[in-house]
Amino acid sequence: MALSDADVQKQIKHMMAFIEQEANEKAEEIDAKAEEEFNIEKGRLVQQQRLKIMEYYEKKEKQVELQKKIQSSNMLNQARLKVLKVREDHVRNVLDEARKRLAEVPKDIKLYSDLLVTLIVQALFQLVEPTVTLRVRQADKALVESLLGRAQQDYKAKIKKDVVLKIDNENFLPPDTCGGIELIAAKGRIKISNTLESRLELIAQQLLPEIRNALFGRNPNRKFTD
């Protein structure tokens, strides 16, 4: 049975409505999927940027902490250096005061004479040379000349060897030297300084840890002494 024009039109409208509905549903499905993908990508980008920002500020925070530690360490080191300088200056002042007192030693002729003989003989033990020249302060020349025989006797009594001692009459120790002598042997190739200053310096180096301990107390963090 043939369809009437009205039926055909009705079928066509029905098909068009179905096609339109299917197209709308497909479009909505595409839109939903696109929106979902957009939201996922947006979330990924947001998270990625958030991580970058967090990493940036974590790095900055670490840099700030490191800078603080460096500054703190530098300040601590500077403070320690200042303390050390003050202590060393104080030790140096103690030694300077000792040097001033050394200048008083030659005023006691008996004490100074015994000291000169001891200094000469000690140096002769180190040299063990047959002929030795003594360099002295010009002010001490006569005194040292009077002590040469005594020094030679003391040396021979202890080492069983003779030694010829003579004073350098052309070159003297500086007048501001506190006292003592220099001994020269082997045509000037060997020289021993036994001035009062050099002896004080030697003793100071040996006793420096004890001097520090006496002035400031023992350092509990220090395992070894100088």
Swiss-Prot record:
What domain of life is recorded for the organism? Eukaryota
One GO molecular function term of this record is: proton-transporting ATPase activity, rotational mechanism
Tell me which UniProt keywords the record has, alphabetically: Hydrogen ion transport, Ion transport, Transport
Q: Which InterPro entries match?
A: ATPase_E_C (IPR038495), ATPase_V1_Esu (IPR002842)
Record's GO cellular component terms: proton-transporting two-sector ATPase complex, catalytic domain
Please indicate if the UniProt record lists NADP as a keyword.
Answer: no
Q: Which purpose does this protein serve, as stated in its record?
A: Subunit of the V1 complex of vacuolar(H+)-ATPase (V-ATPase), a multisubunit enzyme composed of a peripheral complex (V1) that hydrolyzes ATP and a membrane integral complex (V0) that translocates protons. V-ATPase is responsible for acidifying and maintaining the pH of intracellular compartments and in some cell types, is targeted to the plasma membrane, where it is responsible for acidifying the extracellular environment.
Subunit structure and binding partners: V-ATPase is a heteromultimeric enzyme made up of two complexes: the ATP-hydrolytic V1 complex and the proton translocation V0 complex. The V1 complex consists of three catalytic AB heterodimers that form a heterohexamer, three peripheral stalks each consisting of EG heterodimers, one central rotor including subunits D and F, and the regulatory subunits C and H. The proton translocation complex V0 consists of the proton transport subunit a, a ring of proteolipid subunits c9c'', rotary subunit d, subunits e and f, and the accessory subunits VhaAC45 and ATP6AP2.
Write down the PANTHER family for this protein, in alphabetical order.
Answer: ATPASE H+-TRANSPORTING V1 SUBUNIT E1A-RELATED
Family under the similarity heading: Belongs to the V-ATPase E subunit family.
HAMAP family xref list: ATP_synth_E_arch
Q: Write down what this protein is called.
A: V-type proton ATPase subunit E
Q: Which organism is it from?
A: Manduca sexta
Species classification: Eukaryota, Metazoa, Ecdysozoa, Arthropoda, Hexapoda
Name the encoding gene, please.
VHA26
